[in-house]
């Protein structure tokens, strides 16, 4: 009788069924739907108003149409469905203000996996791809204070906390950095 595959084999096979590719304008409705699926469970327990603000500001069709030409964006597809995405690029190309930063930074702005597809290695694959496509010797990212799962995920993959940006109204942003290249 054939042996049943282990959980590790199943996970590896499920991850192998996932393809990564650059996002296009045709993906915008799927990106919005991904945001609706992943943003509320991620940030709602931290601050429900903040979760809604994120969706309204950063996950709209207009915002994606504006950022796609300026930011590098990857999607992960499984069975023809967009199940995850990541965006990254230079801090100076962003529309946001970062008064605490001098100089420029390579930043991964987003890494989001649909909750039905967590734990299959998709986030790790996207992160590795972003690291390999990043020009420069370090990669930065922000984690919202209280997003412990994401924080632990990044620390286990070589990121270290550098600074915290406080905001009276909203949760703090914690900036993490990972050396790339030889120290990867
Ligand atoms: C953090 C996140 C990107 C990780 O993606 P993923 O595809 O689930 O990650 P992987 O399968 O590659 O790796 C899973 C790792 O994350 C941990 N993990 C986090 N959430 C998990 C879940 N729901 N199920 C299983 N593992 C989970 C595991 O401990 C595992 O770590 P290990 O491999 O060191 O044991 C994903 O959980 C996510 O999209 N979270 C919500 C959005 C978010 O917080 N994004 C980051 C914004 S800064």
Language-model features and meaning:
Residues 3, 100-106, 137-152, 156-184:
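C-terminal "cap" of GNAT-fold acetyltransferases
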Residues 18, 83-89, 140, 159:
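A broad helix-preferring feature
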């Amino acid at each position: 009788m054939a042996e049943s595959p282990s959980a590790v084999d199943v996970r590896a096979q499920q991850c192998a069924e996932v393809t990564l590719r650059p996002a296009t304008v045709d993906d915008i409705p799927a990106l919005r739907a991904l945001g609706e699926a992943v943003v509320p469970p991620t940030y709602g327990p931290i601050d429900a108003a903040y979760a809604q603000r994120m969706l309204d500001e950063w996950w709209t069709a207009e915002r994606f149409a504006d950022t796609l030409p300026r930011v590098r964006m990857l999607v992960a597809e499984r069975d023809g469905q967009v199940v995850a995405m990541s965006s990254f690029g230079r801090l100076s190309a962003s529309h946001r203000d970062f008064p605490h930063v001098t100089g420029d930074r390579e930043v991964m702005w987003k890494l989001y996996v649909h909750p039905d597809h967590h734990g299959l290695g998709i986030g790790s694959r996207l992160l590795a791809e972003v690291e390999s496509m990043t020009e420069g010797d370090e990669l930065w990212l922000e984690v919202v204070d209280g997003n412990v799962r994401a924080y632990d995920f990044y620390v286990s993959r070589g990121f270290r906390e550098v600074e915290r940006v406080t905001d009276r109204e909203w949760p703090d942003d914690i900036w993490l950095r990972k050396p790339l290249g030889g120290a990867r």
